[in-house]
Design a protein with these regions (language model features):
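Conserved N-terminal phosphate-binding loop of PLP-dependent enzymes in the Aspartate aminotransferase
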Residues: 1-169
Length: 169
């Protein structure tokens, strides 16, 4: 999302809105995106560029968090570690509309919900809302440590050979 805004749209927008009680991983960037202080404890200083205090299922909270640096909104369609809380379908639809209105990318973290774990290949299919970017892992590798980020065709302009890497090097 950051790279797309800077390389393709020429905008200095880098902040990603995430949600309280979310969990996005344990790398430095993904734990910074996580909305749980207990996960971040002991890792300061954390990288800038994430706002992790939006209230899940509250569109007004997201609207209030958007500023001129915001490039994307990222959420889990089911907050697993946050208490197994599913996103409200109306909230997800409103979030898509809001992102479109404000020129933001919508990112779904499908690490826990993707690959058939919710009854469809990806949970977003059940919401009738298509993200700009989504991530998958866990179920993708069936125990093998692998993950993927998938995005709409418009995003490929931001990536060329060598601009995105793998942990397998």
């Amino acid at each position: 999302a950051r790279r797309y805004m800077q390389k393709v749209r020429g905008e200095d927008r880098y902040e990603i809105i995430t949600f309280r009680q979310s969990f996005h991983g344990r790398t430095l960037a993904t734990l910074t995106a996580t909305g749980q202080d207990k996960v971040k404890d002991g890792f300061a200083p954390l990288p800038a560029g994430f706002y992790d205090q939006a209230v899940y299922n509250d569109i007004e909270s997201v609207r209030a968090a958007i500023n001129d640096r915001t490039c994307a909104v990222m959420l889990e369609l089911v907050q697993a570690e946050g208490g197994v809380i599913p996103a409200d379908p109306q909230f997800v639809k409103e979030l898509r509309r809001l992102c479109d209105e404000r020129g933001l990318l919508l990112i779904f973290d499908e690490v826990q919900t993707g690959m058939g774990r919710t009854g469809s290949l990806f949970a977003y299919e059940q919401y009738g809302v298509e993200p700009d970017i989504f991530t998958v892992a866990k179920g993708l590798g069936n125990g093998f440590p692998i993950g993927a980020m998938l995005g709409k065709a418009k995003l490929r302009e931001a990536f060329g050979p060598g601009s995105h890497a793998t942990t397998f090097g």
